[in-house]
Every structure is written in C-alpha cells, then in structure tokens.
Amino acid sequence: MFVLISTQLGNAQQNIVVDETIYLHANASTFVSGETLLYKIYCLKSSDKTISPISKIAYVELVDSDKKSVFKAKIKLENALGQGDYFIPTTLKTGSYKLVAYTNWMLNKPASDFFQMDINIVNPYKTNEKTPNSNVLTSNSNTLESSVNATDLNLRLNKKVFSSREHVDLKLESSNDNIKEGSYSLSVRKLDNIPTQNSISATNFATIPSNTVVLDGNSKAVLPELRGEMISGKVVSKSGTDKIQDVTVSFSLPGKSFVFQVVKTNSEGRFIFSIDKENYNPNIIIQVIDERADNYSITLDELPSINTTQLAFSPNNNLSYTFKESLLDRAVSSQIENAYIHRKKDNLEKQTTQDPFYATKAKEYVLDDYTRFKTLKETITEVTTEVYHKENNGVMHLHVTDPSVFPQLPDPALVLVDGLQLQNQIDLLKYNMKNIYRIDLIVGRYYVGPKSFNGLVSFITFDKDFASTQSGSSILKTTILRPQLKKIYNNVDYTNLADNARIPDFRNQLLWNPDVKLNKDSQTSFYTSDVAGNYEIRLEGFAKNGTPVSIKELIEVKDTATN
C-alpha cells in the first residue's frame, strides 16, 4: 500500500476542509503513435475555481482499458500551475485510455472528483489490432461556448486564411483586470475527420460538481505536499526489539543543488522528507544515523496511487480503420517530424543553482587557489588544517578542530560529498582529490534538523558524480519518480525562409504555449506548416477570480502547391 502517511488529525481543534481540484488542458484527445500529448495543469479550489495554495505537486496517469496505468508523471506546481508531456510510443495498442490528474490532498476525496479525460490512441503499426467497424465513433462537434463576454477578452487575427509557412499574428486583449491577471494555455492544432472524444473545456469543467470534503479531528488523512515532493518511509527493527521511535534518519539527493535533510521517526518508525529544491536527480540515499544502525532496515513508501477499478470507460469508443487516409497522413507526419526533431527540439528551462543549506556559515577552500595534493591526508594536512582524521578497524571519521573547546569533543563532523552523507569516510582515503573543486568547513556545533554534529566538512566535486561503496540494510539507495523538467516548447520561425527551406514541415501542432499571461508578453503568434487544412486555436484557463475562460477560433491553411 502506498501510504503516505495516513496521519491522525486528533490534535486539530477544528475540522479540515479538502477544497482542491485539478483541471487539465490537453492539446488533443486522439493521438497517433509518434505524436505527443501536451498538457497544462491548473490546481484550483473546488469551491470557487481560484488557485489552490495547498499542493505543490500533481500527478498525471494514463490508464488503459484494462485499467492498468501505462504512464505516470509527477508535475511540480508553481503558483498552482504545472505542465508536462508524453510521447505516445508504438508499444501502446490502439484503444481507449483515461487521462487522470490529482494531488495527494485529493486522495482524501472519491475518485469521481479526480480530473478524468477520455483519450483515444491509434497505433497504425499494429494492424492485427483493428477494431470492428460497429464501434466507430461519431465525429464530435468542435463548437465551444465562450465563458466570457466578447468585450472582456478578444482573440484577434490578422486574417483567417493563410498559405504554408506564413506568419499568423494572434493577439489576446482584455481590459478586465481579473482576466488580465489570470492564467491560460494556448493550443493550435489541425482538425481532421478522425473521430475524437469531447475535450473538457474550462467552461465545462467549472459546471461539473466537485465536492469539498470535511475531515474531522479523528480522521486519518493523506497529507498534502505543502512545500514540495514528499518522500516517506519506515525504519524497521530487524530483531523487533530495538526502538523505532526517535531514530535519526538522513536523506541525500546529490547533485549541483543538492538536498540534505535529517529527521527523527515517530512512534511507528515513520519518517517524511520534503523536497523543495530544483534538483531533478532520481537517485536518493536514505540512511539511519545511529551507532546501532546495522540493527535497522529502511522501507520506502510507494507513490500515491488511484484505484483504477473505479474508472468508467465510455462504451463503444473504439476507433476503426475506416479513416485510413487521415490515419496515414497523421502517421507519416509524425514520422517525418520525429526524423527532424533535432532541428525543432524543445528547450529545457534553465534550473536555478541554489547554494547549500549551510552556505552562509561555511568557510570555503577552493582547491585551485592552493597547491593541489592527490590524497585526502595531504589535503587536510596542508590546506584544510582545521580538519583531522581518526581511523579504527576500517572505519574513518573526520573531525573539525574547535579552538573554543578544550578538550576537543569526541563526536565526528558531518561529512558530505556533493550532498551525500558519508558516515564512514574510508572511501575518501583512496579518492583523488584532484576531482574536488572545493571543501566547505563549519567549525563548532552544527544542527541539521534535530541532529547536532561537531562541525561540517563538505566536499564539492567538479562533476557532481561521487559514488559511495558503502552499503547495508540501514542505507537505502534507490531511484524515485521525479517531476518532469519544465520545457520551453519550440516555436518554428520562418523570419528567414532560406534558413529552413530544405527542412520539411509536417507539424499538425502549430503552437503549444502552456504559460500564457495577458499582463506580460507571451508567445501567441506562430507560423503555419506545410500541412494544409483547418486548424483550431483554443485558449483555456481561469481568470484571477476563478472565472473559466474557453475560447475557440478556426483558421485555414491553403495548399500552396495548388494555388
């Protein structure tokens, strides 16, 4: 079972209201293998559809008709907003799927309150999976009711008919402050005769009942991820006789902006860590810090999960191959676009580098500023002279001399390498110090959470790739699902036509901007592709006061070769 921690709210003096829901805007509801599902997440209050300040992480799952999850993503929410994507692989068979979005906090509500969207996937490469013609979907209407007055938000185009590779000047204008300060996502995608599921507009979503749930003081609740990702687990006594309460546990997420935390277990041996730094390394290390650490083992809780048996799939929603021409066009387009993906690649948003948690108190030794030595013993003797070591029976500890204390305290220092705690520093004896960029030191008693250390010694390598050989039941090394990296989606530019004249352009998705803001410059203009047809411009989102906004417009791209 997943836990997260089912915690009793017995200390609460009043009821707690779970007032949270998710709206997800997807770029389409029918996909061919090789295409990409793009989506924007809005985390909202159920009551009034304004942004929810509670959760900082959302989850998105794609569930097949056998009610098995085939894709799961963790999405970081910034100001209640997030974005992600999923490349549809050829391993997925043709059929009906359900896209589900939720937060930890929403797991306290019934499954019917999770965001659910029907998705069709067509795999033209698995011809033995053709579905019977009797189950053909009827084409759904693409009409949308605007949720705002025409005078409140205007979608302006320079014209309605374009040639291939022509610039489309699209502007969004509003004089309404609530709308101007809202959050929106914009999709421009080709329409064809392949049947689709009805997309859920923000307007429609706002009319769907979403209940608030009241938890009383005696309820057990799944905790919300208030500050960031929540990593939880349990310390187990291998003999069953060692205490499991108040056991000190450390968490290391190594890397450039590393995370290091220390907590103590509760009466059940449970612990929780919360990650709020921009470090997307999936490799984590959790350790018991105790003289009797070998008496314990560590188990990690599974990710939050939904009961897929409660999901209802629409009847008769299989696609047939009577739409061969359109399916072939889509399949060929995706193949060509994927072949030239290196010329139209999306960019990852640059991550901000954050200083270590101890930065304001540490003394830095940048080793290039000194004569370099190959070994640790030489380096601490000649450079970081405050540090000394003690060895005994294959165990080595580093200590930091504190001139204000005599005699020196026997406790060792906290030793980190790129954020990874080394309780036994024997690995460093044979490590080439030429790989170390700098050493940070703190002299004197230093607290990390509830644990005090006699100083700190932190080694920062050039490549941030230090690997420890230490293992045991009290050291858990594992990989976890991390949030998707935020992308800046590629927007093809034909300002200079000659630059890309020889590159084919078979885009069916002309623009995807998941972060449209009316109160500042946002990318809303775009260029058409070489694919003729009708395209739908679709804007979804919510005004600052929770008013849903759903606007649609159509444009036509003419086949230049036939003009």
Specify the residue positions occupied by each region the protein language model found.
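Surface-exposed, low-complexity/disordered segments
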Residues: 28, 32, 53, 89-94, ...
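Periplasmic plug
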Residues: 399-442
